Amino acid sequence: MRPPAFWFTPPDRPALAARLLAPLGQAYAAATARRLRAPGHRAGVPVICIGNLNAGGTGKTPTAIALMQRLAARGIEAHVVSRGYGGRLEGPVEVDARRHRAADVGDEPLLLAAFGRAWVARDRAAGVRAAEAAGAQAILLDDGFQNPSVVKDLSLIVVDAAVGFGNGRCLPAGPLREPVEAGLARADLLLSIGGPEAQRRFATDWPALPVPRLTGRLATLQMGMYWQGARVLAFAGIGRPEKFFASLRAEGAELLRAEALDDHQPLGEALMKRLEIEAMALGAQLVTTEKDAVRLPPSFRQKVLTLPVRLEFDDGSALDAALDRLNLTARS
């Protein structure tokens, strides 16, 4: 289900629906604040939370990949702990791409497991304990910023610069899980992801934020595929599929059809067969995101191309300084 348009009107000009739903948004914010007062488990290794204030996709998965790689470059074995949204396993269980499917552990953990060790646990504290027992030198908590069950040593809030914090209101009046001021008061860093124009607009709409701000962009990973002039039928079931379609166009692909699916939508045989027939009729190649690709039926994995993207920081010095303060210790 796509988010309603009134979530993204300017904060100083809320739509009628947002104003009518404001009391429910205030109740949601109050419930979140009460929940956050609960005590949490203190791990024996640093816990880095990659969270957001918005419901839906903001770029947490590419951020987790970038942090895994950054920590690996320091000699640190970081394990990701995720709730495993969309998967059936409650865990704690370590994700194994050889035996797990997205229906078992969720698409994001399955993708992250290609870059390092990843765990799924409905009980995040139990997942952290399992990862620590398995030798993790640092924990990357995928989401969970509004979950108090684990004490965080570093919290990085990720926001899509193109949409910012929407109308600044909490669910269901707006896209927020908690008020911006309350969330950023607990955060250590804010990462806004987007191109130069989106970054300028975000800085104008949300000036004087009480937390250091990093900027970055999602860049296409060059894998030898020449996209210029390629006729494609693109499909994506992510938070903002239009970003994926825009990336393909920026690479020079000719999008003959773009199908936006619901976030985490299952890619069953019937759906994929329909898309395959449409692509054949158009003379187009099926293309999707890395995160969607892990949900493909086995019979379609060789038929669908992916456009991988990676997070590139404009200046990662503030992040590196924050990691330095964690006193991470690499094992020999």
From Swiss-Prot:
It comes from the Bacteria. GO terms for molecular function: ATP binding; tetraacyldisaccharide 4'-kinase activity. GO terms for cellular component: plasma membrane. ATP binds at N54, A55, G56, G57, T58, G59, K60, T61. Coiled coil: none annotated. Pathway: Glycolipid biosynthesis; lipid IV(A) biosynthesis; lipid IV(A) from (3R)-3-hydroxytetradecanoyl-[acyl-carrier-protein] and UDP-N-acetyl-alpha-D-glucosamine: step 6/6. Keywords: ATP-binding, Kinase, Lipid A biosynthesis, Lipid biosynthesis, Lipid metabolism, Nucleotide-binding, Transferase. GO terms for biological process: lipid A biosynthetic process; lipopolysaccharide core region biosynthetic process. Disulfide bonds: none annotated. The gene is lpxK. It comes from Cereibacter sphaeroides (strain KD131 / KCTC 12085) (Rhodobacter sphaeroides). Its EC number is 2.7.1.130. InterPro entries: LpxK (IPR003758), P-loop_NTPase (IPR027417). It is an enzyme of class 2 (transferase). NCBIfam families: lpxK. Belongs to the LpxK family. This is Tetraacyldisaccharide 4'-kinase. It catalyses: a lipid A disaccharide + ATP = a lipid IVA + ADP + H(+). PANTHER family: TETRAACYLDISACCHARIDE 4'-KINASE, TETRAACYLDISACCHARIDE 4'-KINASE, MITOCHONDRIAL-RELATED.
